[in-house]
Amino acid sequence: MSKVRLLFFIQIILFHSFFGQSVLYSTVNKKAIKYYEKAIVCFNNISVETGKPDIEGTENLLIKSLAKDSTFWEAYSLLSNLNIEKGDIKSAIFFRKKMMFSSNSVPIIEYYYLASMQIAVGNYKECLTNAKRYQQSPLADKRFMTKINRMIQNSLFALNAIKNPVNFKPINLGPSINSELPEYFPSITADDSTFLFTRRVNDISVSMGRQEDIFVSKRDENNDWSNSTLISDVINSDFNEGAPTFSSDGQYIIFVGCETGAKGDYEYGNGRKGYGSCDLFYSQNNGQKWSNPVNLGPPINSKHWETQPSFSSDGKTLYFVRGMTYNRERRNPNNQDIYFSSILDDGTWSKPKKISSNINTPYREESVQIHPDGKTLYFASNGHPGMGGLDIYMSRMQEDESWSSPVNLGYPLNSFMDENSILISPNGDLGYFSSDREGGYGSLDLYSFKVEEKFKPLPITYLKGKVIDAETKTPLTAYFQLSNLEKGNVISQMQSKIGNGEFLITVPNNIDFALHAEKEGYMFYSKNIYVDSINLSEDGFLIIELEKIKSGTFVLENIFFEKSESDLKQSSIVELNKVLKLMSINPEIKIEISGHTDSDGDNNLNLQLSINRAKAVVNWLIENNISSDRLFFKGYGETRPIEDNNSLLNKAKNRRTELTIIEK
């Protein structure tokens, strides 16, 4: 049981047991009362050095009290509370039960306390019995009814989940990742090659003697994780840094930095400043090293607690957890929700909004991951029907962009303990989580497990490659867009890496899309790709050669027509807009649009079709304010094939629309 929950139980139990009762005890034995009242004083005598009560002294006095009267239920109650303070919940339950059997005058509220402890250790059957007893009592305090109803709901869910367990066989990630120190909050790149996580390290230079840092590991030649190392001295400091999230290509990292709270200076380590509590920062890898982290600023960060970010693979949306704080020193763990913010056209962040009420509850949500498929959300919560503590859930974005009702990932992945730090691999086969279960290297370790089919994200793959200058072959930093041709919307956008020109873009399956690469002074690159069950990553590295704007001919791969017609399909708009942009920012150039067909059918019909198709493109550009004296069109029919017309694939390549810069 977590320390937070222990303290919660202590507060409510002590209040009702000690101050809610009359001074008239259930016993008339004066010696029993004397020992009991001494025990109360002893229990409330908090040590200045340890911050804890005199547990041993209190326990001895209570044993003496019960020796004088074994039906003195108040003494059993305090003895139960004492074991909560010791962290021994099972013994606390034992003495609570003895209290119940010792007297008929035990208040009904004690059934509420007993049920609270029983669900906290996974004793669901007895919790259900005692919770229902309290629920059905006419003396029940209505203020506790919401919590009692949740205990009943969770107990029923848990009993059913235990009868129908999911396949779950966790495997420790081993000493290259784990240590005797706690490891948690993992993140991974879309190509499954780089792994980030948080480790709480010992540090005698800080007041608490420990702080959090971010570590990194990469796949080696055997596909195993290499020995983890600190990610960078620029990112890590002697303050807390953790809960990192990668952009899909690993070029950007967003992480949490927390201030000390000392002297009101909002210091976040390495000279960084913030807005209070924990803030989100970002850093970019330029191919050689990480840049100095920058605070994301308002409206993302606030005086409250921002943490556990997850960056969408399309580079558009950031999901994170915000916890409301009472003040700089105190945070309410039960007022904690998932928010999201999107990058606007001007490059700023939109005002964060709470994600759907289907996901957020009046209780606690955390450990959010938006999968690279962009549609599947994994998170932890104690507000949905579950096993009693924080459980892991999955929700899917619907066609109308609403979120489905969360699905619990089941027992034994979820248990009466708190589960979080969930991460599902890009291909959906493996899940990662943090646990302090037996057999680890000490404290919290990171584990992997096979994800059941029903909990997997939507299938995706990735496109990996490099952008170079067509003539010099030097790497280029280019801007990328991945567009859905059917809907005409941008699916993903990013730029190739500074220094080496490499890129990695996640690609949804079963979508016909256009890939465009642009750089000022260069002709845009266009490619049409359809992804089905084939993993693009298996096809190797895609080398994109950008040519400087000059006289030359380029294939427009994403111009489409109805079969044997010259009517432009709606899916051509993405490409047409790229040509429009080229003409608009380069007013000095003139172009010829040429149409080509394969060799099927009549030669004359093919020639006329190619002319009409080229003319259709020119007419669209004229309708969009490009001067007609800069535009020319011509049809070549089947006379200029680029491949032999001996296969369906080659014929498709020959059916094309080309753009030729004829004057610059």
How should each PLM-predicted stretch be described?
Residues 381, 385-388, 594-664:
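Periplasmic OmpA-like peptidoglycan-binding domain that tethers envelope proteins to the cell wall
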Residues 501, 511-521:
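A short, solvent-exposed beta-strand micro-motif common in secreted/extracellular proteins
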Residues 548-589, 597-605:
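Short, solvent-exposed beta-strand/turn patches at coil↔beta or beta↔helix junctions
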Residues 30-33, 78, 85, 109, ...:
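Short, conserved micro-motifs composed of acidic
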Residues 486-502:
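Short, acidic Ser/Thr/Gly-rich low-complexity loop/linker segments typical of extracellular
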Residues 520-543:
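Structured interaction patches on ligand/partner-binding surfaces of diverse proteins
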